[in-house]
C-alpha cells in the first residue's frame, strides 16, 4: 500500500481491499501449487496426461510456464503430458480449464487426469489501480467422477475487441489501462454472459423435454437459481456491482415481479449504453441485492479481498474461498456459478454442481490458517530490480521461505531460470 500516493486507509476503504501480497514469479507459484496438489492428494505423477497453465505473467516469450512445471514429472519418467500455456489477460485459467474438460470428454482422452494451473502476479504503475495489485496461483485436478462437476448446457460466453487493459510494452510489467472503460467492459460482459447462459440453458432444458427451464419455476427471480456465485475479482466493489447488474437484468425481463415493486419506472427507460454507468441503477440494485449478495456471493470473496487481484487465479481463488467458508453438507447438491473475465476481452459464465463431499478440499486448502500465517513486509523489502536482467541471484529481505515452496534461485548468463524448493 505504501507504494501508492494516496493515504492507505482512504484507498483501502474505497476499493474494499484488505491486504495485498508479493511473491517471486508465476513459475515458482506454479511449481509450488502443482507439487502441493500432487503431495497432498497422493497423486501418482504418471496418472497425469494433460497439464495446462493459464497466465499473463510470462517470464519468456517462447518457453511456456508449463515446461518449467514438467520438472515435477522427471523422476516418474512421465513426459507424455499434453498442454501448454493459455494467454488472454485474466481469462487464461478458464480457457485452460475448458480445454482440460473437453480433453477428458473427447476421443483423445487416454484415461488419465488433467491438471489446470492459473498463476499470475498483477503489477501496476502509480495511480488508482496500484493498490489492487496482488498475486496467486490455483492448481486444479480434472477427471471423471469428481465431487464438483460441470453442468452440461449451462454456459455462456462473450468475446469482443476492446482496449480496456493491455500490455504492448515488453520492457515493463505495467499494463496500459483505462479504468473507467475496463469497468464498463466488465459490466457489459457479465450481463452478456448471463443472457447467453440463459439462452443456452433454455435450449438444453428443451432438449431434455422438460416443461420449462428451472430458472422460471420455484424462485423469486431467475438469479436465485444460482445457489452461490464466484466472480473474477479485480476489486470487491466491482463484484458487488456485477451481482447487482444480474438482478437488474432480471428486472428488465420481468419488471412486474413483486420484489421490484419499489424500483422507479424511469429506470426501465434508461438506454443500454447509459445504463452501464448509471449511478441510480447501480445504487438501486445494489440495495436490492444486498441480502442475496451476503448469502450467495460473500462467502467466495475472502481470498480475493485478502490477496488482491490475482488475474487468472482470481476467480478460482473465489471458488477456494467458497469451499472453505461453506461446509460440505451445505454445499452438497448446490449449483455454483462462475463468472470469468479477461480484458481485451474474453469472458464466460458457467455452472458447477456439487455432487460429493468437499470436506477434504477445504482441509487441504486450509485457507484461513494460511492467510493468517502470512508475513507482513514493507514494499521496499520486496521491490525487485532484476527485470530483464541476467547473471542474477535473488537476495533475502522478504522473510523466510516456508517448506515445500519453490523460489527463483538464479538467472544465468543465458537468461536460464533455476528454481529450488525449500525442504
UniProtKB/Swiss-Prot annotation:
Q: Which UniProt keywords apply?
A: Transferase
> Which SUPFAM superfamilies does the UniProt record give?
Thiolase-like
A GO biological process held by the record: ergosterol biosynthetic process
Instruction: Write the Enzyme Commission number(s) for this entry.
Output: 2.3.3.-
Q: Is Transferase one of the keywords?
A: yes
Q: What does this protein do?
A: Hydroxymethylglutaryl-CoA synthase-like protein; part of the gene clusters that mediate the biosynthesis of the host-selective toxins (HSTs) AK-toxins responsible for Japanese pear black spot disease by the Japanese pear pathotype. AK-toxins are esters of 9,10-epoxy 8-hydroxy 9-methyldecatrienoic acid (EDA). On cellular level, AK-toxins affect plasma membrane of susceptible cells and cause a sudden increase in loss of K(+) after a few minutes of toxin treatment.
Q: What else is known?
A: Gene clusters encoding host-selective toxins (HSTs) are localized on conditionally dispensable chromosomes (CDCs), also called supernumerary chromosomes, where they are present in multiple copies. The CDCs are not essential for saprophytic growth but controls host-selective pathogenicity.
Q: In which pathway does it act?
A: Mycotoxin biosynthesis
Family membership, please give it. Answer: Belongs to the thiolase-like superfamily. HMG-CoA synthase family.
User: Is the keyword Cell membrane assigned to this protein?
Assistant: no
User: What's the domain of life for this entry?
Assistant: Eukaryota
Native organism is: Alternaria alternata (Alternaria rot fungus)
Q: What is the lineage of its organism?
A: Eukaryota, Fungi, Dikarya, Ascomycota, Pezizomycotina
Q: Which InterPro entries match?
A: HMG_CoA_synt_AS, HMG_CoA_synt_C_dom, HMG_CoA_synth_N, HMG_CoA_synthase_euk, Thiolase-like
- The protein's name is Hydroxymethylglutaryl-CoA synthase-like protein AKT4-1
**Recorded name of the encoding gene:** AKT4-1
- Gene Ontology terms for molecular function: hydroxymethylglutaryl-CoA synthase activity
Fetch the NCBIfam families from UniProt: HMG-CoA-S_euk
Amino acid at each position: 500500500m505504501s507504494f501508492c500516493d494516496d493515504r492507505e486507509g482512504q484507498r483501502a476503504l474505497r476499493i474494499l481491499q484488505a491486504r495485498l501480497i508479493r511473491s517471486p514469479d508465476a513459475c515458482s507459484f506454479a511449481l509450488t501449487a502443482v507439487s502441493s496438489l500432487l503431495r497432498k492428494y497422493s497423486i501418482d505423477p504418471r496418472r497425469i496426461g494433460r497439464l495446462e497453465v493459464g497466465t499473463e505473467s510470462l517470464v519468456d516469450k517462447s518457453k511456456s510456464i508449463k515446461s518449467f512445471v514438467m520438472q515435477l514429472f522427471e523422476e516418474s519418467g512421465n513426459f507424455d503430458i499434453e498442454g501448454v500455456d493459455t494467454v488472454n489477460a485474466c481469462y487464461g485459467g478458464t480457457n485452460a480449464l475448458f480445454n482440460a474438460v473437453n480433453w477428458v470428454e473427447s476421443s483423445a482422452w487416454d484415461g488419465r487426469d488433467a491438471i489446470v494451473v492459473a498463476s499470475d502476479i498483477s503489477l501496476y504503475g502509480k495511480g488508482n489501480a496500484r493498490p489492487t495489485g496482488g498475486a496467486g496461483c490455483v492448481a486444479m485436478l480434472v477427471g471423471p467422477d469428481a465431487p464438483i462437476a460441470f453442468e452440461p448446457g449451462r454456459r455462456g460466453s462473450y468475446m469482443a475487441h476492446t482496449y480496456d487493459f493491455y500490455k504492448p510494452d515488453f520492457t515493463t510489467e505495467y499494463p496500459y489501462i483505462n479504468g473507467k472503460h475496463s469497468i464498463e467492459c466488465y459490466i457489459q460482459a457479465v450481463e452478456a454472459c448471463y443472457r447467453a447462459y440463459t439462452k443456452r440453458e433454455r435450449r438444453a432444458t428443451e432438449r431434455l423435454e422438460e416443461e420449462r427451464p428451472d430458472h422460471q419455476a420455484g424462485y423469486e427471480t431467475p438469479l436465485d437459481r444460482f445457489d452461490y456465485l464466484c466472480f473474477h475479482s479485480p476489486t470487491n466493489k466491482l463484484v458487488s456491482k456485477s451481482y447487482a447488474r444480474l438482478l437488474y437484468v432480471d428486472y428488465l425481463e420481468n419488471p412486474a415481479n413483486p420484489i421490484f415493486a419499489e424500483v422507479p419506472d424511469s429506470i426501465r427507460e434508461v438506454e443500454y449504453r447509459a445504463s452501464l454507468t448509471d449511478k441510480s441503477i447501480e445504487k438501486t440494485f445494489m440495495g436490492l441485492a444486498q441480502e442475496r449478495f451476503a448469502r450467495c456471493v460473500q462467502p467466495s470473496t475472502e481470498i480475493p479481498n485478502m490477496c488482491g487481484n490475482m488475474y487468472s487465479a482470481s476467480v478460482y481463488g473465489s471458488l477456494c474461498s467458497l469451499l472453505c467458508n461453506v461446509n460440505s453438507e451445505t454445499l452438497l447438491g448446490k449449483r455454483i456459478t462462475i463468472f470469468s473475465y479477461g480484458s481485451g476481452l474474453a469472458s464466460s459464465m458457467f455452472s458447477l454442481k456439487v455432487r460429493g463431499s468437499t470436506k477434504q478440499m477445504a482441509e487441504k486448502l486450509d485457507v484461513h490458517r494460511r492467510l493468517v500465517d502470512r508475513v507482513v513486509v514493507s514494499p521496499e523489502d520486496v521491490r525487485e530490480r532484476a527485470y530483464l536482467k541476467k547473471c542474477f541471484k535473488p537476495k533475502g529481505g522478504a522473510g523466510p521461505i516456508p517448506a515445500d515452496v519453490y523460489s527463483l534461485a538464479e538467472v544465468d548468463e543465458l537468461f536460464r531460470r533455476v528454481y529450488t524448493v525449500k525442504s
